[in-house]
C-alpha cells in the first residue's frame, strides 16, 4: 500500500509540513506563491490549483515545507498578502481525517474530553499555553452535584492553536490521556438543511467541498451547493452569508455549508461523571461528530492537496480533482461539480 502522507528525513509526515492557502488572487502563480512563503523556510512543493479546461486559477493552492517548524513560522507571520491580496493559510489535515466534519472548521474553542476528577482548570491552562494564548479554560460540572462531567472547553485568541492541537492525538495531563476536538456551535453541522443556489467552495451552482463521489467537490455535497462560510457559518458569529473566501472571483463561500451528508451530534457524549451516554453535544457545542459530512466518502483531506511523486517538486500528482461543474471565476475555490479526475 502506498503511503500518501510521506515522511521526510526527520520523520515528519507530509501533512504537518503542508499548508492550504485559500483566497488566492487569479493572478497568483506557483512561482509567486512560492516566492512569498519561502521567506519562512525551504519549500519542496507548491501548486496553485487550476481548472483543467480553462487553465484559470481556482483560487486556492498548497505549499509543502521541508520541516514542520516552518509551518509554525509561516502561521505566526500572518496575515499574508500575495499579489496584493490577503490570503488565508490553514494547516493541512491527514487524509484519514477527511471523514470528520470538523476537519476543516475554523474555530478558536477546543473541546477536551477525558477530564479526571483530579484535573483542574489551571492544569488545562498550563498544558495548552504551549500552543498559544489561552483566553479561558472551563471544566464543565453538574449543576446540582457540582461533580465534574468529564469534559472541558479551552478557548484561544486564534484558530491556529486549535488546528495544531487537533493534528496531534497524543495529549496527556497529569499522566492521563485526554481527547481533543474542535468545539463547533450547535446547528453548525454540515449537511442537514439543503444548500442554496450559490456555489460550493468554488462558486457557481456546483457541489460543496466533498460529496459522495471520490473527487474534490463532488456534486453530492451540501444539498446543491455547499459553501465555505456561507449562510451556515462554521465559526462562532462568522459567515452568515458574508465572510467568504475568494472574494470577487467567486471564491470560497456562498450557499450553505461545506458539503456532505450527515450532521453533527450523533455518537457518544461525555456526560454524567465523565462517562459516555449518547450525543456529543454539550453546552451549545458539538465536540465530535461521528457521521460523515465534510468530504463525504472521499478519503483524502483538503490538506492532502495535489500529492507529488517521489521526486518531490515537479513530480506527477496523484490526488483527484473534479473538473466539471461551475467555477468561481478567478477567485475559485474547492469543489465544483463532477466526477471526472485528472
From Swiss-Prot:
Supply the CDD domains for this chain.
Answer: RRM1_hnRNPA_like (cd12578), RRM2_hnRNPA_like (cd12328)
Q: Offer one example of a GO biological process linked to this entry.
A: mRNA splicing, via spliceosome
Q: Where is the RRM domain?
A: 17-93, 108-185
Which keywords accompany this UniProt record? Nucleus, Repeat, Ribonucleoprotein, RNA-binding
Coiled coil ranges:
none
Extract one GO cellular component term from the record.
catalytic step 2 spliceosome
Q: Which Gene3D superfamilies match?
A: 3.30.70.330
One Pfam match, by short name? RRM_1
Q: Where is the composition biased (Gly residues)?
A: 189-230, 237-278, 293-315, 327-342
Cellular compartments annotated:
Nucleus
Lineage, top-rank taxon, reads Eukaryota
Keyword RNA-binding: yes or no?
yes
Which GO terms of the molecular function aspect are on file?
mRNA 3'-UTR binding
Q: List the disulfide bonds.
A: none
Task: Please list where the region (Disordered) is annotated.
Answer: 180-342
> In which broad location class does this protein mainly occur, judging by the first location in its UniProt entry?
nucleus
Sum up the protein's function in the record's words. Answer: This protein is a component of ribonucleosomes.
Please identify the protein, giving its name as recorded: Heterogeneous nuclear ribonucleoprotein A1, A2/B1 homolog
- Organism the protein comes from: Schistocerca americana (American grasshopper)
Gene symbol? HNRNP
Amino acid at each position: 500500500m502506498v503511503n500518501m502522507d510521506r515522511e521526510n528525513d526527520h520523520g515528519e509526515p507530509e501533512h504537518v509540513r503542508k499548508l492550504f492557502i485559500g483566497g488566492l488572487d487569479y493572478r497568483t502563480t506557483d512561482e509567486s506563491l512560492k516566492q512569498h512563503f519561502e521567506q519562512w523556510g525551504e519549500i519542496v512543493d507548491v501548486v496553485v490549483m487550476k481548472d483543467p479546461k480553462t487553465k484559470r486559477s481556482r483560487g486556492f493552492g498548497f505549499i509543502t515545507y521541508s520541516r514542520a517548524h516552518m509551518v509554525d513560522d509561516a502561521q505566526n507571520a500572518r496575515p499574508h498578502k500575495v499579489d496584493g491580496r490577503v490570503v488565508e493559510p490553514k494547516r493541512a489535515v491527514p487524509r484519514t481525517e477527511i471523514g470528520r466534519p470538523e476537519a476543516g472548521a475554523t474555530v478558536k474553542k477546543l473541546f477536551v474530553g477525558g477530564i479526571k476528577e483530579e484535573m483542574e482548570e489551571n492544569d488545562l491552562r498550563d498544558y495548552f499555553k504551549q500552543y498559544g494564548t489561552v483566553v479561558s479554560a472551563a471544566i464543565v460540572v453538574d449543576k446540582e452535584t457540582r461533580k465534574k462531567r468529564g469534559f472541558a472547553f479551552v478557548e484561544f485568541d486564534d484558530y491556529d492553536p486549535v488546528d495544531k492541537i487537533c493534528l496531534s492525538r497524543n495529549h496527556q495531563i497529569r499522566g492521563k490521556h485526554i481527547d481533543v476536538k474542535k468545539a463547533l456551535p450547535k446547528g453548525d453541522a454540515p449537511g442537514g438543511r439543503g444548500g442554496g443556489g450559490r456555489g460550493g467552495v468554488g462558486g457557481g451552482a456546483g457541489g460543496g467541498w466533498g460529496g459522495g463521489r471520490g473527487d474534490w467537490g463532488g456534486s453530492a455535497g451540501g444539498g446543491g451547493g455547499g459553501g465555505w462560510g456561507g449562510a451556515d457559518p462554521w465559526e462562532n458569529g462568522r459567515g452568515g452569508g458574508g465572510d467568504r473566501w475568494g472574494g470577487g472571483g467567486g471564491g470560497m463561500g456562498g450557499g450553505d455549508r461545506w458539503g456532505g451528508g450527515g450532521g453533527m451530534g450523533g455518537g457518544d457524549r461525555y456526560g454524567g461523571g465523565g462517562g459516555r451516554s449518547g450525543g456529543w453535544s454539550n453546552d451549545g457545542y458539538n465536540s465530535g461528530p461521528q457521521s460523515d459530512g465534510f468530504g463525504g466518502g472521499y478519503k483524502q483531506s483538503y490538506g492532502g492537496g495535489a500529492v507529488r511523486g517521489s521526486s518531490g517538486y515537479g513530480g506527477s500528482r496523484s490526488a483527484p480533482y473534479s473538473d466539471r461543474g461551475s467555477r468561481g471565476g478567478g477567485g475559485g475555490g474547492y469543489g465544483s461539480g463532477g466526477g471526472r479526475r485528472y
